[in-house]
């Protein structure tokens, strides 16, 4: 569930989300290692936190590429409060870092954070910044400060053990009107700095309590929405993906007796029979003008 709204005469906006089930679904769909669960989980939470601020029909993609062993993590959200995502190396594991925590920064390494905002126009808006920590939350805050000139704070956490995802969530606070009094800015910064980690915070407090601790007072009107893991892949799109292959590749699949397309976003497998591949090959013949 995501909670969102504004404070201080709409000069500050916030979102806070708990999405353990969503991250657990991602873990199961992609058969993720512990570390990969934390990395993708953090990215999905980051993408979820911006959903209340998206334009209608907007698709927002967080794409992080680094020189670490996970190589790439991609999370996408929509204005309908859905998320989906994947990592390039779902089985990555590393020793715990010096703080005894999952080494997310080590898994990602040095690299770039790219945001793609697709508003349904001809060309999506793409912006890129260098990674400042590889921990994802700080990188998102840096992106908003540099690319969108919005002072932001993000805090994101995923707790996972042998039984699965225990806690997954985070919050984002953004100053969208620079006329906000300096003492309020300093108060928010101080309160956020004094909060424990998300994993600990969500064990001891409910989202509305966390917001009260951030802003120093009870929040007024708060909207809510359910975050869901949802992919828009289907069999027809999978078939079109096969049609992109050259004729020889399709013929090789037909000889093997079947063809398979796996969606990178949700790991759904679409299997096509020898007969279906025969039909697709006819399209290839027709395309060639024969």
From Swiss-Prot:
Under oxidizing conditions two disulfide bonds are formed involving the reactive cysteines. Under reducing conditions zinc is bound to the reactive cysteines and the protein is inactive. SUPFAM superfamilies: Hsp33 domain, HSP33 redox switch-like. Its main location: cytoplasm. Keywords: Chaperone, Cytoplasm, Disulfide bond, Redox-active center, Zinc. Coiled coil: none annotated. It is found in: Cytoplasm. It holds the Pfam family HSP33. The keyword Zinc applies. Belongs to the HSP33 family. PANTHER family: 33 KDA CHAPERONIN. This is 33 kDa chaperonin. It comes from Thermotoga maritima (strain ATCC 43589 / DSM 3109 / JCM 10099 / NBRC 100826 / MSB8).
